[in-house]
């Protein structure tokens, strides 16, 4: 993340987390600056022009801060000419299992934010409502295969025709880069004050086959940006 615009976007997106304390602020900056999926979802125009979002396993809400900052800069006329318009955000709902992260989100966004609502809950149990976009970034492999399939079926049922499910997975067939991903995942989760049990990962081909069998069209693209990892973005749309 080197261009002046991206630095401005990063500053704007991480600003709300100053009120959440040193860790929340620097965690948001580190994640948003080093993780190419945030930039690419905007640059490639993957998101609808306007819509309601549900982020499952949302953590402290870094994705929402990023999208809000993007829309603010777009409306101010500070936006790359070759990028699609930043999406209009009708509703941003996040579900996070860990109360510590929910508390950090509350300090960042406040209790009466007009768009953002982040709640403590388990994605295996909560009602998904009727969003236009559902995201799971790096949390789908935290629970077993049967629950993964159940969550994906419920995501498909919750989305409207053409609705977007955007996720990122670690490709279990990638060898050493996959194992490096897992090590980093455990390390980051530990720093956030949590512990991870076994991770339930799959080869990329198996993820794609499962999602297509549930009624999604699937496109996939590596999201590593020069790092020796095995992260893959899956862009899934309900037929």
Predicted regions and their residues:
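Class I (Rossmann-like) S-adenosyl-L-methionine-dependent methyltransferase catalytic domain
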Residues: 1-51, 60-127, 166-239
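Conserved beta-strand/loop positions that form the S-adenosyl-L-methionine
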Residues: 56
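A conserved beta-strand element that flanks and buttresses the S-adenosyl-L-methionine
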Residues: 135
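Short catalytic micro-motifs in class I SAM-dependent methyltransferases
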Residues: 138-139
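Helix-capping/helix-break motifs at membrane-protein junctions
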Residues: 144-145
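A short glycine-rich, Lys/Arg-flanked "PGG" loop and its adjoining helix->strand segment in the class I
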Residues: 149-161
């Amino acid at each position: 993340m080197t261009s002046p615009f991206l630095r401005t976007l990063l500053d704007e997106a991480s600003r709300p987390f100053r009120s959440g304390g040193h860790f929340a602020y620097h965690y948001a900056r580190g994640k948003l600056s080093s993780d190419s999926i945030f930039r690419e979802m905007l640059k490639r125009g993957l998101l609808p022009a306007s819509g309601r979002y549900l982020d499952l396993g949302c953590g402290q809400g870094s994705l929402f801060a990023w999208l809000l900052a993007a829309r603010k800069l777009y409306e101010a006329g500070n936006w790359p000419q070759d990028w699609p318009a930043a999406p209009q955000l009708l509703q941003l709902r996040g579900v996070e299992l860990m109360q510590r992260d929910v508390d950090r989100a509350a300090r960042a966004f406040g209790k009466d934010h007009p768009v953002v609502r982040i709640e403590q809950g388990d994605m295996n149990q909560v009602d998904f409502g009727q969003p236009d976009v559902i995201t799971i970034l790096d949390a789908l492999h935290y629970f077993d295969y049967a629950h993964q399939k159940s969550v994906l079926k419920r995501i498909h049922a919750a989305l409207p025709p053409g609705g977007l499910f955007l996720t990122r997975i670690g490709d279990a067939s990638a060898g050493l880069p996959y194992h490096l991903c897992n090590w980093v995942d455990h390390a980051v989760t530990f720093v956030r004050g949590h512990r991870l049990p076994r991770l339930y990962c799959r080869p990329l081909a198996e993820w794609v086959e499962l999602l297509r069998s549930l009624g999604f069209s699937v496109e996939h693209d590596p999201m590593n940006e020069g790092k020796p990892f095995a992260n893959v973005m899956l862009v899934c749309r309900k037929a």
